[in-house]
C-alpha cells in the first residue's frame, strides 16, 4: 500500500470501467504551509479578497441618509470675528443625526470572520459597537474643543429643551387620545 493514500470507493453507476476494490488517491503535488495538518481548500487564499471586492462594489449602492456638508466657520470664531457658523453647526448637531459615511457592514464582518476562526457573533458585535462609540466620541470631543465653554452649556441647554419639547408633545398626544376614547 502507498503511504499517505486515501482509499475511495467508486460505484459502477458513476464510471463505465471500474476496477474491483478501492482505488488509492495520492496526495501528490499538494503544497502545505509549515505546521499545517491538512492542505488548504482551493481558492482559500483569494476568497477574502474576492468577497471584499464584491461587497465594496455593492457598498456604493446602499441607501444612505442625506448628510449636510461640514461647516468651515470655526476658523473665524477663534479670533472672535464671527460666532454665527459654530452656532449653525451646533444647531445642526442638535436637531439632525450625525452621519458622515456609509460603509457597508458586510465587509467589516467578513474581515472579522477571516481574522480568526473562533470569532463569534457577540464578539464581532462588541468590536463593531466599540469602534462606532469611539468614533462618535472623537467627533464630539473635536467639535467641543473648538467651541468656547459657554457654547457647551448652550448645547446642553438646547438638548434638554429639545428633549422636554418631545416629552411635552407626547403628553399632548396622549391627552388627545384619552379624550377620543372617552367620547
From Swiss-Prot:
Membrane topology designation: Single-pass membrane protein
Regions crossing the membrane: 153-175
Keyword terms of this UniProt record: Membrane, Transmembrane, Transmembrane helix
Entry superkingdom: Eukaryota
Keyword field contains Transmembrane: yes
Location of this chain's protein in the cell: Membrane
GO cellular component: membrane
Note from the entry: Partially overlaps RPP0.
Full protein name: Putative uncharacterized protein YLR339C
